[in-house]
Amino acid sequence: MSILHDITRLLLPRRCPVCQRRLEYTEQSLCAVCASCLPRLWLPGIDDNDMLRHLWTRVPVEHAFSLVAYRHNSPFHQLLMRIKYQSDTALAYRLGWWAGSEAVRAGLDEYADVLVPVPLTARRLRERGYNQARLLADGMGRAMGVPVMELLVRQQQGTSQTH
């Protein structure tokens, strides 16, 4: 690390987006306490799980996995609200980096040839100005060393999954 980087971290310390505690030097996105409190999913395998079956009905994929269960009023829900509705794009990238790092730690990165974010409708993209799935995928891809490609086209508007 450069001296400038170290000075910047001293003057502008990074904080955990959940509890606002100052991140330790080894903590990249979330503090260890908050990361350990996320409702993790360790699926039985990436070749036979609910996520894969769900996606296969929409688009052919060989492998799929999910790291965190979505639950209303959980810290993870609060993070997604900040990303989607408070334009916290930096948080999206950081959360993606965390997820990608966890995938690498679990050895799941060896199965990934490409990460494909789910697209927004043109109207939603205009309203929001960014695709949070793309930002999450960019962070994951960077951590995993895997390219991100936009290969899907949104055909219809669905309902919000976070409300």
Residue ranges and their predicted role:
Residues M1-H163:
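Glycine-rich phosphate/pyrophosphate-handling loop used in enzymes and phosphotransfer proteins
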